[in-house]
Swiss-Prot record:
The gene is dxr. GO terms for molecular function: 1-deoxy-D-xylulose-5-phosphate reductoisomerase activity; manganese ion binding; NADPH binding. The lineage of its organism: Bacteria, Pseudomonadati, Pseudomonadota, Alphaproteobacteria, Hyphomicrobiales. The keyword Oxidoreductase applies. This is 1-deoxy-D-xylulose 5-phosphate reductoisomerase. Its EC number is 1.1.1.267. Pathway: Isoprenoid biosynthesis; isopentenyl diphosphate biosynthesis via DXP pathway; isopentenyl diphosphate from 1-deoxy-D-xylulose 5-phosphate: step 1/6.
């Protein structure tokens, strides 16, 4: 299992634990800070970072007496310095400062910087051998094998903070890796689960943002509507738990109560359940190897009444099929998959393409990448970032013809 601990055999740390939160003002960061707020005296905040939300960062820095804060956007640095003048809190700006925050001594770090920008800071924490709650998808989708190998070499402990992967992480502790036969990741099906393909094709932005169960950011909500997010999770699961594509199944589960299941060789299936609240998997990571008191609502199965499941439709939701294709292709294909999707979603939000064109742009970019002979194994973070950059450019160049095509 590499850097992901299969068994909870890490000694319990005595005393106050130091924590760093990268991406403290985003949705994952907000949930993390809420959990820290609910455990006064148990944790001390070392560093906090944000992309550009200086107002929220300053409030958190003062509330938690952080020792170091950093903002990625250079245009906001003056505001940050002025707001914290005389506080004794160190301030930094730009990528180097985010990396510095990740490099500072901490017992536990939340890696929640979104996008490819989160890769180098996460690697900096890995190199310190830190226990990392990983919420950044790009670390695994763009540089999975390289990232996990480096983590194992450095002795870093990677804890999956995403709800589905955290569910698998918990269920896997019921057996040994060589006893595993498959894992099952659940998907709500999103707002278009029952829609016809023709209706999905022309879905509006407002419709795509109406997720039935989860409260999330704009980008991930659109990814959930296309099931691109589930495709990314398939890729992440393969990297985290050293799985082949054939060992990973996706099951549509509209209630979002069962988050993941693991099947073992004796055909026992162990599942993790909980209300759809991101604070639950984050609390599991924050307390690990113990468990802390979480603020999520208690699960009441009697009031829910029914849990239903159905097979995913790879025809109506081609983004999921493309994830398996990218995983089997390897050699940077998953990086291309993610990068092209970023361009496609931005184009959809900007009303440049229809919803149905998101997956078509991703597929066209992947096919173009393979035809150009660009496939090559990743040897460094810079390799992953370069592929991400070049794939974005290719997707952007293909965008006009994809937008022009009638369906």
């Amino acid at each position: 299992m590499g850097a992901v601990p299969l068994k909870n055999n890490k000694p319990v740390e005595a005393g106050v634990r130091t924590v760093t939160v990268l991406g403290a003002t985003g949705s994952i960061g907000d949930s993390t800070m809420d959990l820290l707020r609910g455990a006064p005296g148990r944790y001390r905040v070392e560093a906090l970072t944000a992309n550009s939300n200086v107002e929220a960062l300053v409030k958190l820095a003062r509330e938690f007496a952080a020792r170091f804060v950093a903002v990625a956007d250079p245009a906001r640095f003056g505001e940050l310095k002025d707001a914290l003048a005389g506080s004794g809190i160190e301030c930094g700006v730009g990528e180097s400062a985010i990396i510095e925050a990740a490099s500072r001594p901490a017992d536990w770090l939340m890696a929640a910087v979104s996008g490819a920008a989160g890769l180098k800071p996460a690697l900096a924490a890995v190199d310190r051998g830190t226990t990392i709650a990983l919420a950044n998808k790009e670390c695994l989708v763009c540089a999975g094998d390289f990232f996990m190998q480096r983590a194992a070499k450095a002795g870093a402990c990677i804890l999956p903070a995403d709800s589905e992967h955290n569910a698998l992480f918990q269920a896997l502790s019921s057996g040994n890796r060589d006893e595993l036969t498959r894992v099952i990741i659940t998907a709500s099906g999103g707002p278009f689960r029952t829609w016809a393909a023709a209706d999905i094709e022309k879905a509006t932005l407002a419709q795509a943002l109406k997720h039935p169960n989860w409260s999330m950011g704009r980008k991930i909500t659109i990814d959930s509507a296309s099931m691109m997010n589930k495709g990314l999770e398939v890729i992440e699961a393969a990297c985290l738990f050293t799985l082949t594509p054939d060992e990973i199944d996706v099951l549509v589960h509209p209630q979002s109560i069962v988050h993941g299941m693991v099947e073992f060789s004796d055909r026992s299936v162990v599942a993790q359940l909980g209300t759809p609240d991101m604070r639950t998997p984050i609390a599991h990571c924050l307390g690990w190897p113990e468990r802390i008191v979480g603020p999520a609502a208690k699960l009441d199965l009697a009031s829910i009444g029914q849990l239903t499941f159905e097979a995913p439709d790879f025809t109506r939701f081609p983004a999921l099929r493309l994830a398996y294709d990218a995983l089997r292709t390897g050699n940077g294909a998953t990086t291309v998959y993610n990068a092209a999707n970023e361009i496609a979603v931005a184009a959809f939000i900007g009303e440049k393409i229809r919803f149905g064109a998101i997956a078509r742009l991703v597929e066209a970019t992947m096919n173009g990448w393979v035809r150009a002979g660009n496939l090559a194994p990743l040897a460094s973070a810079d390799d992953a970032i370069a592929i991400d950059h070049n794939a974005r450019n290719m997707a952007a160049s293909l965008l006009p013809q994809i937008a022009a095509k009638a369906t």
